[in-house]
């Protein structure tokens, strides 16, 4: 009845989605209909209508099916835990250095996060037991505002806060690790990741031509990495003895942390441990994990580059299809995993690393938890249907698809024990009616596993698993019902503007553009898109073009054939001007991510801190650190308390363009062409890479004096640009030895 009610509730919103879901659910749930009949505490006058022989047969059928569906995944999990022991132990015995450690790019999207939380997350990355010169953190703000939190963060990293304007991206060296702080136009997490990917692709284009050992780690801004997280990832993906170097993606073990303990946080902690180390261990044993969470996912960048077009594709033209919205927006991590599973050439290329741990902040309130689980449920159900109806996945991962199908059928019995408990409390049933076999197998096997994991990881809260076993089915039912009742609302919660609607004068595409102008492209009213949704439907499965896409053959000269074959190369689209030198850019940069229709904003290569403060400052001796002069920061904070300090339009990037492209007044003998990294600008629709030549008629940029409270090591990470600048007063710096060029990449 619950399933039929949910399907009927969904039907008015999206007929396409309801039909797909109905077929899948009826096939899944019908298998366990006998289990429901013989297990539910039905009234006596109904039970008398069933012959005793039939009830006995159904009971044995239910017991056998239930045992198989629990024991087989449990045995697979035990096998995985034995062969890949979980724990925060160091897997690599030798000491890694700048040449033996693969380069790792850490992408951290930021949206309205407290500076203290960000600093804690950044410190956990740069303090890892991993060569700092091989770590490059991309701290990407989803929004262009320069507010107090932004200023406090960059001041902590060592970037001056007294500048009149700030470029879009700034490079700084913090604890010997390279950090790029960027601000992009607000468009959501996936849009922020997309813009960051474009920036990474520009910075590392030449490096990727020769190497395939660049990895990208996606984490959330509130995550705290374990000290050996990075090197354990690299051990399983690249450095393990006998490795074939073909691992495409891995996820780790995410646990929760909180400052205030409660029943909700306790249940979340046990659920994280059980879900990470049980379900994903089973999936890894079967060929691939089905979810690469955005909170902790390591990808091989060359593989991610090939999927960028499909993962970052614009969905405005498909917004009327609710199924596509849930699949690609609410469940973007599951959708990315699906793309990788289809693109992989063989099994066991998408795995879980049982030695890579991180902590994330647990949700404190029930309302926030309800909204979070609503997103998870809608993203899960759409991608699950997509996966189980994709023939390519059944051929490549038969055991995985079979196990997922079995686990979906067993979800029907999730509320059985809760209903049985209610029947015992209300005395409508006796203790003799309890299905002891079901309880012994389900609770017993899971508790043995959780007891072992709690002792192994020293998370003794896992020993309270029986509490989760009783309460979690009820909470999961609430999440499901709430997700169904609010399925038509395309918003992530919180204060929003009025939802955009479509009518006879406004198409769904125009409604989405209106929502974008209001600051949230997902805040639209789906119920007004029904007529358009009946006319066409979005393909449920990924394109056939990505099947087996992850294969980069090596060329005879030793170069990797990492071609971006889905679109024309950028260099083929450029027509160089006469007597203008060609920009030194990789022949095949990822034009997929740059030429998409919503990428109207220019992406600028990051500026070094020295270029904001003067080139000659680093030639002066560095005195002892003086007490911090916080007058400038206090003045800026007072301005922030009255409102927004500064903002710029990311579509035009006035400030960034001024900082990147404004040349200085040159002497008659100094006719120096700006470095390509400072004269490069990508956009869609106009000249892709215009060169801005220095003009003696343009004025010199004016900067405020450098504050003495600047922290961090402001060391450059790109080739030095020799341009005369006005000498500014600043903190004297020591003469540093030039680093090896490869270690700076």
From Swiss-Prot:
Family: Belongs to the chitin synthase family. Class VI subfamily.
Region (Disordered) location: 613-635, 672-745
Membrane topology reported for the UniProt record: Multi-pass membrane protein
Keyword annotations: Cell membrane, Cell wall biogenesis/degradation, Glycosyltransferase, Membrane, Transferase, Transmembrane, Transmembrane helix
InterPro entries: Chitin_synth, Nucleotide-diphossugar_trans
A cellular component annotation (GO) from this entry: cell periphery
Entry's localization field: Cell membrane
Protein name (record): Chitin synthase D
Transmembrane parts of this sequence: 26-46, 55-75, 412-432, 434-454, 464-484
Ranges of biased composition (kind: Polar residues): 707-720
Gene of this entry: chsD
